Amino acid sequence: MAMAINVKKWIEENTEYFLPPVCNKLMHNQQLKVMFVGGPNQRKDYHIEEGEELFYQVEGDMCLKIVENGKHKDVHIKQGEMFLLPGRIPHSPQRYADTVGLVFERRRLDTEKDGLRFYVEGSPEVLFEQWFYCEDLGTQLAPIMKEFFSSKQYKSGKPDPDQPKAKMPFCLSTEQVMEPFSFQHWLNKHRLEIIQKKCVSLFGDDHETKAVIYGGGESKQSKAQTDVWIWQLEGTSHVTLGNEVLKLGSGDSLLVPEETLFSWTREDGSIALSTSQVPLPM
């Protein structure tokens, strides 16, 4: 049974999970993974996945360390800012105390692999890496980290010449990442356009992340091909799932499961974020 969740209240009720050693809590863990992450959490490992990740800083700032075209780079995401990370870019989130960030990623396709990588200190040279099919990153990381900390590479800080280089299942992205932007400033700038067009995309159609701002209006019944997460930012709306009608007030959210028929009616003055991730054909 679908249920509306007030985001602010949910964060307050789950504060304990945003502290070490856990530092995160999944609100939804289906086709779309909707998670909130806290800190402090400083790390050396870099994660690589084929899909995109969408970041939004709810409270406080964070630093996302990435390797862009062979060069280390820090992406600073401030409170209230949004950032879309392309797939196939090594990244390492650095989070601080008293911060909370919202992160979206999707369930992996059967053909996809994730990588966990460490670099030689201050260098783009790979020190250690492993590739695996990601089902539950939280539990799968521990044995890989344990193997790394007992390895020659960790003890010497240099690659092991006797260790064959891992074969990468795909090439890294050569895309240059975007600059983080203030979500509220974006809303203010596009408010008239949202009212006139009824909906405006944040990132366009050439990304697998479909993040769309909806104003007042109606979305007729259709089937969600993937999970759709709705966050009612202003005003009210009503989502119909079968015979069930759910009212969303300001701050409420709702996950519409994949393959579900639904319709959505938004009152005048409504502003809502709809987020889904549809894997792009390779």
UniProtKB/Swiss-Prot annotation:
The keyword Metal-binding applies. InterPro entries: 3hydroanth_dOase (IPR010329), 3hydroanth_dOase_met (IPR016700), RmlC-like_jellyroll (IPR014710), RmlC_Cupin_sf (IPR011051). Its EC number is 1.13.11.6. The keyword Ribonucleoprotein does not apply. It is found in: Cytoplasm, Cytosol. Keywords: Cytoplasm, Dioxygenase, Iron, Metal-binding, Oxidoreductase, Pyridine nucleotide biosynthesis. Fe cation binds at H47, E53, H91. It catalyses: 3-hydroxyanthranilate + O2 = (2Z,4Z)-2-amino-3-carboxymuconate 6-semialdehyde. Coiled coil: none annotated. One of its GO terms (cellular component) is cytosol. It holds the Pfam family 3-HAO. Pathway: Cofactor biosynthesis; NAD(+) biosynthesis; quinolinate from L-kynurenine: step 3/3. Catalyzes the oxidative ring opening of 3-hydroxyanthranilate to 2-amino-3-carboxymuconate semialdehyde, which spontaneously cyclizes to quinolinate. Monomer. This is 3-hydroxyanthranilate 3,4-dioxygenase.
